Curated annotation (Swiss-Prot):
This is Carboxy-cis,cis-muconate cyclase. Homotetramer. It holds the Pfam family Lactonase. Pathway: Aromatic compound metabolism; beta-ketoadipate pathway; 3-carboxy-cis,cis-muconate from 3-carboxy-2,5-dihydro-5-oxofuran-2-acetate: step 1/1. The active site is at residues 149, 197, 213, 275. One of its GO terms (biological process) is beta-ketoadipate pathway. It catalyses: 3-carboxy-2,5-dihydro-5-oxofuran-2-acetate = 3-carboxy-cis,cis-muconate. It comes from Neurospora crassa (strain ATCC 24698 / 74-OR23-1A / CBS 708.71 / DSM 1257 / FGSC 987). GO terms for molecular function: 6-phosphogluconolactonase activity; carboxy-cis,cis-muconate cyclase activity.
Amino acid sequence: MPLHHLMIGTWTPPGAIFTVQFDDEKLTCKLIKRTEIPQDEPISWMTFDHERKNIYGAAMKKWSSFAVKSPTEIVHEASHPIGGHPRANDADTNTRAIFLLAAKQPPYAVYANPFYKFAGYGNVFSVSETGKLEKNVQNYEYQENTGIHGMVFDPTETYLYSADLTANKLWTHRKLASGEVELVGSVDAPDPGDHPRWVAMHPTGNYLYALMEAGNRICEYVIDPATHMPVYTHHSFPLIPPGIPDRDPETGKGLYRADVCALTFSGKYMFASSRANKFELQGYIAGFKLRDCGSIEKQLFLSPTPTSGGHSNAVSPCPWSDEWMAITDDQEGWLEIYRWKDEFLHRVARVRIPEPGFGMNAIWYD
């Protein structure tokens, strides 16, 4: 079928889910539905369940759950408060739901991370028979200054890896049959200025890739088969051009922040992105070729994105083909579709949606 649908959320209120239709023959994108959701629950990160019948959202002070009946029929079913620290849900704290990961194996629990202050706990939710977020079954502790921004399972869904941006480390947990998790251990990032934001894993389970937000690089880790802990290989790759001015001369603050990394459907390639902290600068997108064992063979390109990316610039490879990738930005509100062919990347379609906070990550429905 030439028609595909993607759903996208927003960084700021009012809450809405946008459904975009991409035609892979005519190479066009168009907005076909704006679904209103609770106004004070904009979704800054969303993901599907294993069957794409439910959307789970990180929605300010809530974790939200929607039944997806069709690309244009999305129904809000539940919203749950942030678990863990008693102050996380207070209106006067900046604690915010930031990321969630849906298990693909029974019991199909959902693993959620708050961010900023009072974010030292991961939240585990059970789901109903239809996939609705049902109950907060565990609030497992990281450490007081933790701020997890991304997680990934190994291919067997036995081990869970978390990128702790504020505590500057990677955590490993073991998943139990109940869906709850127990701590295995943690390792510090290679450099005090790295701040891991995102993790991706090779389909073999041999290698983990950690995206460093402040370090603006991808660091490669091999998984120790005995301990299941990640071990840094001392191979890293830039996500902004080497030598580019990366500090504001007046404030000393960083000008760029790496964002997201994700593998293509085949597992042969990985894309990663960075954002600029000033609108007059551009973000960057990088592509990598992976060996069959999972190690990074080489960096294929590092190219500027049309805008800074704002809070977003999130890359979203198509989950059933290496050919397509989506990228979103909330500086100007673009969703763009790129084609990956013969190890070259080119944009084929785009649509601008000038709504507040559009667009955060895009998820591929069909």
